[in-house]
Amino acid sequence: MDPALLTPMMQHYVELKRQYPHAILLYRLGDFYEMFFQDAQRVSRELELVLTGREAGAIGRVPMCGIPYHAFDRYAAQLVAKGYALAVCDQMEPADQAKGLVRREVTRVITPGTVLEEELLQARQNNYLAAVVRLKGSKQAPCRWGLAYADISTGEFWVCQSEGQEQLEQELARLQPAEVLLPTEEGLGLGLIRPGDPQKPLGLPNQYAYTLRPAEPFELAVARENLMQTYGLRSLEGLGCEGLPLAVRAAGGLLHYLEETHSPQRCVAPKTLLQPSPQGGHPLLPPPRTYQLTDYLILDAQTRRNLELTQTIREGAFVGSLLWVLDHSRTAMGGRTLRRWLLQPLRDSEQIRLRQDTIQELLENPSLRARLGSLLDSLYDLERLANRVGSGTANPRELVALGSSLGKLPQLAELVGEAKTPLLQSLQQVDPALVDLGRRIEHTLLPSPPPILTEGGLIRPGVDPELDRLRQQVEQDRQWVAQLEKSERDRTGIPTLKVGFNKAFGYYLSISRAKAHQVPKEYIRKQTLTNEERFITPELKEKEARILTAQTDINQREYELFVQLRQEAGSRAEAIRQVAQTLAAVDALFGLAEVAVQQGYTRPLLTTDRRLIIEEGRHPVVEKSLPQGLFVPNSVQLGSPHGPDLIVLTGPNMSGKSTYLRQIGLIQILAQMGSFVPARRAELGLCDRVFTRIGAVDDLATGQSTFMVEMNETANILNHAGERSLVLLDEIGRGTATFDGLSIAWAVAEYLATQVRARTVFATHYHELNQLETLLPNVANFQVVVKELQDRIIFLHQVQPGGADRSYGIEVGRMAGLPQPVIQRAEQVLALVEKHSRIGLGLRNQGKSQPAQKNCKKEPAPNRSPDPAVGDQLSLIPAPLFPD
């Protein structure tokens, strides 16, 4: 497009668009943000807005779409949620003061991962920006990768380096980043790839927004220099990432992106994200912290989904998830902390014990718990407020919220004065500077200031002498105007005379047209309306000028005082953030204590051995959804020296097998996140991973059938589980033919019991697997029992030793309302199948076994040496599942 064919304004628009080709450019024109060309068409389609046009010069009309400036947050939130980046161009001077074209500049770039505005964020979820650097692997070695992620709204910054594509995808699934940065060496051009776009980076899920960046900021030397310069370091040893080059590269690329999207030339805030405040202080993002995957209990995406940790499987709803049961925290920052703990349980028994101790103290002191809850209720989101003041973007109401929250710190310190646990004791140490800052904010700002900075109404009386003088002058002049109405009525004899004001004409004298003949000669007619005439006088205009000038000075002075106060708060951002993190942890543990009291949870004993003992365990979500006392508790014991490693669980459909599996997994996760658990007693060995294979779904996007998905997930478990893992399997093999399914189920159970030795519960309708108990010493049979009546069955939901020999599928079909002819025919077919089943005959006849071939090719797996004693047992497995 030839710029010479465009109007000057459109030339400027096109020039800015070339600087931000991958963002939607919102161009401020008066009271609207306008978009043109393809941006207008895209936004019109995405937001269902009217697409209009505008004359652009010699090329004629071009597509145009606009949003009102006062509705910017609402529309911007929708676009960011859809994965778009926004470049916001604002007017930098009033239109009536411009000499020629109004000066406009891009003041901020908003991308899905760089959002700071409260309206664009979810209160109880982090908004992570991630950066990934990958080195391709080979058949002999897995790929290596570095990951950095940050939430610039809360000040979190973490780095990690590991290997394996699956492990990288698991971390991304845990974080659910709003945006992922990749260097262009990943094989695609620069730009933003929105969620669901088929043009995704090779080998990565397409559910995230990817931003392809220049490779240079991700180079090791450049990234090291960026990190050291940003944080004033001479080396990276203090950060713990000196020996993690891929993590350093990812962190450097992430910092460069933030510098670019929040650079001083593009930001109207007093300071930028990574620029220290004038008073010293720290950058908005603190130095990154390093972690290892092995520090935490690993939960893959399938396990998080199957156990419904944060949302239900069917509706994707929060209500009905484990987090719904647990989240009794009183603040948004406490809710975010609890969510992180749930998705990243610990493996460090000492850290777990510290959390348990805090919950225990709150449980044993109801008065402390009640008063603490009341104080937490009065706190605002200090984590995000810290970063809002740190970035210089906090509005007056946010600063008032900060002052109010800081003012509660002395009360919190007094409340926990006799606390015994370290976390509560840490609240006793209050930074006097933060208390003083809170008082200064409360003494400076009015309690309910307007959201707009430049319209006054911010500062309390008595704070600034010059401001008080100006306000007094305005008040005196306004009193004169008010008295003018009475004096002019008396002087003119017009009782309906009024003094009015509007932005177009300022002050005026309003007189009805019926009395217009009584108007004094010195009145100057300004406007004629249907029923009234409006006049001004020289004296009234003089007072108006004084009032308006003084009001402008007042607004400017209030703005200056507010910015000074915000900068003072910004210099304390790091201290506020540290206090906020402590309070968030206390709030999360307070919520867990509340749940423990309300639901009758107990403190689990965490051990370093493999024992998993749960007495009268309960499913936390199902229990809460039922009337009190109706849930039937059940026990389990795995991994003991003389107990089973694998339980074969049989029982009817609808009896509660899946609930039993899930509650075991949930109790283990709750224990390792530091929570109390829904059980009478629990003694749990620390797990390294929890695996689940529950439910059946297909994956149409990748062309995988239900059974293929099931086999992929099962293969993942068999190749990665170890003896410290917990494995929960439900109906392996049901998605294919009976013989194939039974064979696979048998082989999987056998492999888990003899090779992996993970603590496993294997729910199945293949009752033939009950034979494993007699063949393998570390396998036991359990069943979910029912009570049979003459015409129906009653589900008791009780798990007891022994194997079931019926699934009662026809009875469940009858309960579901299948037509009676179908039920009768099913019973006839069942009788024939049971009588002539070659599977049943083979098992009853106990034929000879055929040992598995040792030279079969299989997926790579951890090096496992079979126990010779177990090998001897394999020869006892009945072979004629497929008799000759």
UniProtKB/Swiss-Prot annotation:
<keyword id="KW-0234">DNA repair</keyword>
<dbReference type="InterPro" id="IPR027417">
    <property type="entry name" value="P-loop_NTPase"/>
</dbReference>
<keyword id="KW-0238">DNA-binding</keyword>
<dbReference type="GO" id="GO:0140664">
    <property type="term" value="F:ATP-dependent DNA damage sensor activity"/>
</dbReference>
<dbReference type="InterPro" id="IPR045076">
    <property type="entry name" value="MutS"/>
</dbReference>
<dbReference type="Pfam" id="PF05188">
    <property type="entry name" value="MutS_II"/>
</dbReference>
<dbReference type="Pfam" id="PF01624">
    <property type="entry name" value="MutS_I"/>
</dbReference>
<dbReference type="GO" id="GO:0006298">
    <property type="term" value="P:mismatch repair"/>
</dbReference>
<dbReference type="GO" id="GO:0005524">
    <property type="term" value="F:ATP binding"/>
</dbReference>
<dbReference type="InterPro" id="IPR016151">
    <property type="entry name" value="DNA_mismatch_repair_MutS_N"/>
</dbReference>
<feature type="region of interest" description="Disordered">
    <location>
        <begin position="843"/>
        <end position="884"/>
    </location>
</feature>
<protein>
    <recommendedName>
        <fullName>DNA mismatch repair protein MutS</fullName>
    </recommendedName>
</protein>
<comment type="function">
    <text>This protein is involved in the repair of mismatches in DNA. It is possible that it carries out the mismatch recognition step. This protein has a weak ATPase activity.</text>
</comment>
<dbReference type="Pfam" id="PF00488">
    <property type="entry name" value="MutS_V"/>
</dbReference>
<feature type="binding site">
    <location>
        <begin position="651"/>
        <end position="658"/>
    </location>
    <ligand>
        <name>ATP</name>
    </ligand>
</feature>
<keyword id="KW-0067">ATP-binding</keyword>
<dbReference type="InterPro" id="IPR007695">
    <property type="entry name" value="DNA_mismatch_repair_MutS-lik_N"/>
</dbReference>
<comment type="similarity">
    <text>Belongs to the DNA mismatch repair MutS family.</text>
</comment>
<dbReference type="Pfam" id="PF05190">
    <property type="entry name" value="MutS_IV"/>
</dbReference>
<keyword id="KW-0547">Nucleotide-binding</keyword>
<dbReference type="InterPro" id="IPR007861">
    <property type="entry name" value="DNA_mismatch_repair_MutS_clamp"/>
</dbReference>
<dbReference type="GO" id="GO:0030983">
    <property type="term" value="F:mismatched DNA binding"/>
</dbReference>
<keyword id="KW-0227">DNA damage</keyword>
<dbReference type="InterPro" id="IPR036678">
    <property type="entry name" value="MutS_con_dom_sf"/>
</dbReference>
<dbReference type="InterPro" id="IPR007696">
    <property type="entry name" value="DNA_mismatch_repair_MutS_core"/>
</dbReference>
<dbReference type="GO" id="GO:0005829">
    <property type="term" value="C:cytosol"/>
</dbReference>
<dbReference type="Pfam" id="PF05192">
    <property type="entry name" value="MutS_III"/>
</dbReference>
<dbReference type="InterPro" id="IPR000432">
    <property type="entry name" value="DNA_mismatch_repair_MutS_C"/>
</dbReference>
<dbReference type="InterPro" id="IPR005748">
    <property type="entry name" value="DNA_mismatch_repair_MutS"/>
</dbReference>
<dbReference type="InterPro" id="IPR036187">
    <property type="entry name" value="DNA_mismatch_repair_MutS_sf"/>
</dbReference>
<dbReference type="InterPro" id="IPR007860">
    <property type="entry name" value="DNA_mmatch_repair_MutS_con_dom"/>
</dbReference>
<dbReference type="InterPro" id="IPR017261">
    <property type="entry name" value="DNA_mismatch_repair_MutS/MSH"/>
</dbReference>
<dbReference type="GO" id="GO:0003684">
    <property type="term" value="F:damaged DNA binding"/>
</dbReference>
